[in-house]
Amino acid sequence: MSVMAATAVVSPQAEASESWYLALLGFAEHFRTSSPPKIRLCVHCLQAVFQFKPPQRIEARTHLQLGSVLYHHTKNSELARQHLEKAWFISQQIPQFEDVKFEAASLLSELYCQENSVDAAKPLLRKAIQISQQTPYWHCRLLFQLAQLHTLEKDLVSACDLLGVGAEYARVVGSEYTRALFLLSKGMLLLMERKLQEVHPLLTLCGQIVENWQGNPIQKESLRVFFLVLQVTHYLDAGQVKSVKPCLKQLQQCIQTISTLHDDEILPSNPADLFHWLPKEHMCVLVYLVTVMHSMQAGYLEKAQKYTDKALMQLEKLKMLDSSPILSSFQVILLEHIIMCRLVTGHKATALQEISQLCQLCQQSPRLFSNHAAQLHTLLGLYCISVNCMDNAEAQFTTALRLTTHQELWTFIVTNLASVYIREGNRHQELYALLERINPDHNFPVSSHCLRAAAFYIRGLFSFFQGRYNEAKRFLRETLKMSNAEDLNRLTACSLVLLGHIFYVLGNHRESNNMVVPAMQLASKIPDMSVQLWSSALLRDLNKACGNNIDAHEAAQMHQNFSQQLLQDHIEACSLPEHNLITWTDGSPPVQFQAQNGPTTSLASLL
């Protein structure tokens, strides 16, 4: 907060006429905005105000200014807290002093949270909310702040209640824009809680409010982006990759519209409308991110790579000027997705270096590490499968299961752990227990179309290894039906090649060929290196069995090329120091196993 900004709202002549006060304030602001800032001198100027035994209004405002400067520009949180507590205490005794009173409450509760004194922040915010009902801007802002605090504590029920209160208050004070923000925020939390029956009517209402609201074009489009992001993520959570396409297209058009609008100062007539969801640049990265999520699920991995590169470039530019924690969250989620892409496309060494980079990013923030530790271990488990370290894969997935409460992630991990047990071939008891928990025919734990299709595939794979071919075909045809319905290309390719293998074993070469050829075409399009390797081996054997020697030779050559590429990448990955991360299953990742100079990826120059 600018220390001079306060003078713009100082109405009593007692403040404005004190020339000593204005002079000290001017010096303080000069030192604060110097390049580099001279914070110590700024603080001295503000402290000097107290030497003049100022009136209560100046005293309270100066405590707020000192607390703000110390909080934002120094590590002296104790002194910042003392000044903010005094500002809050004194300002409550002064009538019509809302700007200082509620700014102090907001900043002080933020500081309490930073010091892990959440129990001090909550009653402070509740008191401020209680006495701010005649000040729409501050009442809404404080409700948002307390809801966010509850969300960070994973108390989503209390957060939803507060957002509901905020939505009703915004309606009463005639702010449909801020009502939509409260409702969309509540919808986001309901999606996180998987309360889908409550989400659908709420999103329908939000859609109507957004379309009917006539106001600033950037604010209107930002509401539409928020609304569409919720719809897209809802579809993606449900694994409905094809159904989401119209919404995703609308979202991409919407962000293009926003990028053409001028960032004029928004000065709404209703003070309750003085909010925005995200800066335009952040929204742009978010749209890239959901596009990457869609491309990853659909199996368009080159497209996922392209949008990841664009998003990471944008993020690096933004992070030079903006320390907002959401940017680090975006970066982490992007890396999580691109790592999975690398493992599929046969770039294990690069994936491993990016896992190391992810570890470093998460270690910069305890909250980031807490929120993404399960994903980190899951990615390491997937890497372990790719380099055939099955014991380590099991340890990583078991650790990830211990750390997650997210049902979709839990199901994803269990599905992959089941594939590890199938490959090991001697873990039948554990495997049966796992398969019972992800039975796609009965009480499947999540509503995700994609994960249910994957569960059918895992059942088919297990039946194949046990020689129960008719049962395997039933499961795989179910996977094919589901994956074709939603354009899940990787699952389609995997199911086709496994069906082709079954028909080959049964001696039905024609039917096998009908499965393997499209599997190979689809795997090349993705590109999925493992399925290409498997398909080329089958094509070689099929053509040899049918006496097609030229085709058999061509397929053998392809298989040899894929084998060489994968072997070379395997050797490179296992020789990296980061490979030792596969043994990490507890606490923070060991620093000695991480690359100290960052990854040498295609993005090295940008990162």
UniProtKB/Swiss-Prot annotation:
Gene3D superfamilies: Tetratricopeptide repeat domain. Its main location: nucleus. GO terms for biological process: cell division; chromosome segregation; maintenance of mitotic sister chromatid cohesion; mitotic sister chromatid cohesion. InterPro entries: MAU2, TPR-like_helical_dom_sf. Pfam families: Cohesin_load (PF10345). SUPFAM superfamilies: TPR-like (SSF48452). It comes from the Eukaryota. GO terms for cellular component: chromatin; nucleoplasm; nucleus; Scc2-Scc4 cohesin loading complex; SMC loading complex. TPR repeats lie at residues 102-135, 374-407, 453-486, 493-526. Keywords: Cell cycle, Cell division, Chromosome partition, Mitosis, Nucleus, Repeat, TPR repeat. PANTHER family: MAU2 CHROMATID COHESION FACTOR HOMOLOG (PTHR21394). Plays an important role in the loading of the cohesin complex on to DNA. Plays a role in sister chromatid cohesion and normal progression through prometaphase. Interacts with one or more paralogs of nipbl to form the cohesin loading complex. Belongs to the SCC4/mau-2 family. This is MAU2 chromatid cohesion factor homolog. The gene is mau2.
